[in-house]
């Protein structure tokens, strides 16, 4: 992140407020106003409140769950959480570490990356995904759920509201199809969706938004992976397909992804069909109901 410059009076205010808030937590509203005035906002929901801290929110508890879970059980670099604040409708604000570095999207588009730099970053990405996939699922079933399995999930691919958890991949896939039974899926969506949703998959912990803007780079390596709001337990292909649910227009990024993490090209074809024909299945509009149930 670019270093900000301040005049003397602003620096004194920042030092005073930062010192006070370290030992005596100020109201959230005060800290957010202070951050917006003296630091910066990082759209859509992040405010920098000191030289080394940000507050993100309102967000769903599943994001906090994921940050704490991944930090505890892996060595994947994630921001440290300091405290939370309650918000309306069951949401929270999370005060966390501001990781020093530049997001990969900005770095790639602004300066480009040499082949050696890309190789180093992709090696780190491979290691991070491998660590997430090594985590044992909380149950033996093929669930789709948050880190703790207790909270609802969120995902821009699905819609603005929480959804799930699901007791099986079949139930999740039916949800993605808008309730269309697997028996009529081929007629409704075509062979790619039918074939993908007829397979059995392992369950892996998944970031589910592992795109360049959420990867912080420092000294040529991954310093942190941020924005864990979409993460949870998903079918094994979800990480790969969700990386492609993004508008980052650099073919060399996607080429590197194909070499860094397990590929699921058939599932990506199925997902692209659903993105076109039935996007945001979590939005309440229409949903197939079997008259026999």
Region annotations inferred by a language model:
Residues 58, 208-211, 227:
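Domain-wide signal for the mature, well-folded portions of proteins, strongly enriched
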Residues 100, 212, 230:
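Short, glycine/acidic-enriched loop or turn micro-motifs at the edges of active sites
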Residues 36-159:
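ATP-binding pocket architecture of kinase catalytic cores
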Residues 279-293:
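ATP/Mg2+ or Mg2+-diphosphate-binding catalytic cores
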Residues 1-36:
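Juxta-kinase regulatory segment immediately upstream of eukaryotic protein kinase catalytic domains
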Residues 169, 200, 204-205, 218-270:
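Active-site Asp-x-Gly
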Residues 86, 118, 125, 131-208:
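An alpha-helical support segment within catalytic cores of ATP-dependent transferases
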């Amino acid at each position: 992140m670019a270093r900000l410059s301040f005049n003397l009076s602003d620096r004194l205010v920042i030092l005073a407020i930062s010192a006070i808030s370290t030992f005596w937590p100020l109201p959230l509203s005060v800290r957010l106003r202070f951050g917006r005035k003296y630091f910066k906002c990082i759209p859509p929901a992040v405010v920098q409140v000191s030289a080394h801290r940000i507050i993100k929110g309102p967000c769903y508890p599943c994001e906090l769950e994921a940050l704490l879970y991944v930090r505890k059980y892996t060595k994947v670099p994630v921001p440290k959480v300091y405290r939370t604040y309650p918000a309306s409708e069951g949401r929270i604000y999370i005060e966390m570490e501001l990781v020093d570095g530049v997001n990969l999207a900005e770095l790639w588009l602004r300066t480009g990356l040499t082949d050696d730099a890309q190789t180093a970053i992709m090696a780190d990405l491979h290691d991070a995904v491998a660590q997430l996939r090594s985590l044992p699922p909380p149950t033996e079933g093929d669930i789709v759920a948050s880190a703790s399995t207790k909270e609802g999930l969120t995902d821009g691919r699905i819609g603005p509201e929480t959804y799930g958890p699901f007791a099986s991949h079949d139930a999740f896939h039916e949800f993605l199809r808008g309730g269309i039974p697997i028996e009529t899926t081929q007629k409704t969506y075509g062979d790619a969706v039918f074939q993908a949703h007829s397979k059995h998959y392992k369950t892996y912990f998944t970031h589910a938004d592992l795109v360049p803007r959420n990867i912080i780079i420092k000294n040529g390596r991954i310093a942190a992976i941020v924005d864990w709001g979409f993460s949870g337990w998903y079918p094994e292909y979800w990480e790969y397909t969700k990386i492609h649910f993004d508008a980052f227009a650099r073919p060399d990024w996607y080429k590197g992804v194909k070499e860094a993490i397990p590929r699921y090209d058939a599932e990506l074809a199925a997902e692209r069909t659903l993105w076109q024909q039935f996007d945001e299945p979590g939005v309440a509009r229409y949903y197939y109901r079997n008259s026999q149930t």
